[in-house]
Amino acid sequence: MSDVEENNFEGRESRSQSKSPTGTPARVKSESRSGSRSPSRVSKHSESHSRSRSKSRSRSRRHSHRRYTRSRSHSHRRRSRSRSYTPEYRRRRSRSHSPMSNRRRHTGSRANPDPNTCLGVFGLSLYTTERDLREVFSRYGPLSGVNVVYDQRTGRSRGFAFVYFERIDDSKEAMERANGMELDGRRIRVDYSITKRAHTPTPGIYMGRPTHSGGGGGGGGGGGGGGGGGGGRRRDSYYDRGYDRGYDRYEDYDYRRRSPSPYYSRYRSRSRSRSYSPRRY
């Protein structure tokens, strides 16, 4: 080998040796860079993952808390609706709050009324008149009035009357002697009236509209004698059953046909959607 070739070979080796120390640090640097970057990325990823997990947990806790509060509120409402009232509360609710119920209308009881000048006569015959009662009870003292109660619709007696005395001693004697007496084939019962005042004419059994063909009025009021019922033809039993309510049934039916209820229209729309058309061959 010549001197020139040896020099070239040595020059290459020196270059390669000079490059190698400078090259290795670059690789080390790159390796160190890659190594330093990768842990930071892993830590960031783990932090983001932990944050997302904590957020999801907090959200789930919020939702579960909302559901729990809603379920508790619903259960509380159901409990409040299905509350069993005590007997005392029911008794309070059963009492009416009308002004007439707060005060006692009558003194005494029906079984044992207090003595007064007004006597009630019960169990009378339909043919007993006020004149007959006046003849019977005037034996015990002066009377201020007699009132036989009549039915306003039929004009017939309802089987009882009220006799008014001027003095309470006379009414006591009349009750003791006339109670159980037979009058016009009927055994009558005499007792003190509870109200202790003059009786207004009772409406009778029929509470509907008056007859179109006239008819008489009811009994008398106050302390005076009562008035009898009047004539007029009887109405058909169709109206006595309460079908005459101030408007025609057919008008009401026509109104219902023109404006059906929303429930009825909803039901018809459902039935139409479910109905199937017949097959055509």
UniProtKB/Swiss-Prot annotation:
The modification Phosphothreonine is found at residues 24, 86, 200, 202. It is found in: Nucleus. The modification Omega-N-methylarginine is found at residue 233. GO terms for biological process: mRNA processing; positive regulation of mRNA splicing, via spliceosome; RNA splicing. The keyword S-adenosyl-L-methionine does not apply. There is a cross-link at residue 196 (Glycyl lysine isopeptide (Lys-Gly) (interchain with G-Cter in SUMO2)). CDD domains: RRM_TRA2. Pfam families: RRM_1. Keywords: Acetylation, Isopeptide bond, Methylation, mRNA processing, mRNA splicing, Nucleus, Phosphoprotein, RNA-binding, Ubl conjugation. Residues 117-195 form the RRM domain. Residues 1-116, 199-281 are annotated as: Disordered. GO terms for molecular function: identical protein binding; RNA binding. Residues 196-223 are annotated as: Linker. One of its GO terms (cellular component) is nucleus. The modification Phosphoserine is found at residues 2, 14, 80, 82, 84, 94, 96, 237. Its main location: nucleus. InterPro entries: Nucleotide-bd_a/b_plait_sf, RBD_domain_sf, RBM, RRM_dom. Residues 213-231 have a biased composition (Gly residues). Residues 51-82, 90-108, 267-281 have a biased composition (Basic residues). Belongs to the splicing factor SR family. Binds to A3 enhancer proteins SRp75, SRp55, SRp40 and SRp30. Interacts with ILDR1 (via C-terminus) and ILDR2. This is Transformer-2 protein homolog alpha. It comes from Mus musculus (Mouse). The lineage of its organism: Eukaryota, Metazoa, Chordata, Craniata, Vertebrata. The gene is Tra2a.
